[in-house]
Amino acid sequence: MDKFRVQGPTKLQGEVTISGAKNAALPILFAALLAEEPVEIQNVPKLKDVDTSMKLLSQLGAKVERNGSVHIDARDVNVFCAPYDLVKTMRASIWALGPLVARFGQGQVSLPGGCTIGARPVDLHISGLEQLGATIKLEEGYVKASVDGRLKGAHIVMDKVSVGATVTIMCAATLAEGTTIIENAAREPEIVDTANFLITLGAKISGQGTDRIVIEGVERLGGGVYRVLPDRIETGTFLVAAAISRGKIICRNAQPDTLDAVLAKLRDAGADIEVGEDWISLDMHGKRPKAVNVRTAPHPAFPTDMQAQFTLLNLVAEGTGFITETVFENRFMHVPELSRMGAHAEIESNTVICHGVEKLSGAQVMATDLRASASLVLAGCIAEGTTVVDRIYHIDRGYERIEDKLRALGANIKRVKGE
């Protein structure tokens, strides 16, 4: 397995170009199964999960190629099963189910894998599709969905806010007969992006970005060209990198209005932040950040995917900060690893109490999930001595060329090929 060897401490400064959002690119790739004409998707990040998704679409019979943009022609899809060998590494594959059953009347997906952070059940996807008229069976580790004729529009009230299930229901409802209303829908920018992609293909959707999405079913979706929005979590990660190293950074190809909660907390931490239409700059003026209190919750509140990075920020900040995680259980696996580097933290239920220290020391640490592993790499950049981060395949699932981008900011980081 590959590792990162990071030599610190370094002050990170310079410019970084933000990639397309993984969490928008994946649902958009699967939503392309709904299209009866070719689609071109621009600004798709080069990531393991994206490669897996493209491979899965090919196995279903779609023509998929990448030359800068990703081109998908789903006219000849003739396989309706997403097999275990592709699905086991990636939760996003559940998003194949809604489009398959909506367009072809049948679909089956192996129960998914991905990061092991707490319970991420597929129940909400299943109950949403059932309310649209699909028959669902769980057999031999597969979720199997079928419908005679078309799905039927429905008034669906989500039990809890779920990005994944909102995507599934919204995609399936585009080809349903009649109107579907999703109440308590997720409001994330990536939901808005997926809806806007579907609208480009001819879907009739309104209310995306609010907790009530209305979809009027159409008979077919055509093709089109669409550009994926910038990755707000990658943007936030690089902003934190500059903040903890007392540096300065400009993030290009960013979308500031998707990061309001994160930018507010960085300002609280003492960062000088400016934004333009597609850029964000952060300057610490050489100062150490101040500890901040953070509580994660669904958008537009503070994103759970930035929790590990802010835990690290608090652990090297002036003062004591509290980080409360309300979205996922079991999402503090980075804390014991950071403690190996000299961080002072206590976990009480779903809160980490962070006592800031002046400096961290390099150590051998292990990545446990995607965002936790990013925080360990950033910790290595500012720690004294050498840090080796193991199991970095987690990072490759969500960050495009993170070592190249960090190196351009002054980090001393090398990928060491595993046995």
Curated annotation (Swiss-Prot):
Subcellular location: Cytoplasm
Enzyme class label: transferase
GO CC terms, sorted: cytoplasm
Documented EC number(s): 2.5.1.7
UniProt keyword terms in alphabetical order: Cell cycle, Cell division, Cell shape, Cell wall biogenesis/degradation, Cytoplasm, Peptidoglycan synthesis, Pyruvate, Transferase
InterPro entries xrefs: Enolpyruvate_Tfrase_dom (IPR001986), Enolpyruvate_Tfrase_sf (IPR036968), MurA_subfamily (IPR050068), RNA3'P_cycl/enolpyr_Trfase_a/b (IPR013792), UDP_GlcNAc_COvinyl_MurA (IPR005750)
Metabolic or biological pathway, per its Swiss-Prot or TrEMBL entry: Cell wall biogenesis; peptidoglycan biosynthesis
Annotated residues for binding of UDP-N-acetyl-alpha-D-glucosamine: 91, 120-124, 160-163, 305, 327
GO biological process, one term: UDP-N-acetylgalactosamine biosynthetic process
A GO MF term: UDP-N-acetylglucosamine 1-carboxyvinyltransferase activity
Active site residues per record: 115
Domain of life of the organism encoding this protein: Bacteria
Main location (coarse class): cytoplasm
Residues with the 2-(S-cysteinyl)pyruvic acid O-phosphothioketal modification: 115
Binding site for phosphoenolpyruvate: 22-23
Role, per record: Cell wall formation. Adds enolpyruvyl to UDP-N-acetylglucosamine.
Entry's family note: Belongs to the EPSP synthase family. MurA subfamily.
PANTHER family in UniProt: UDP-N-ACETYLGLUCOSAMINE 1-CARBOXYVINYLTRANSFERASE (PTHR43783:SF1)
Protein name according to UniProt: UDP-N-acetylglucosamine 1-carboxyvinyltransferase
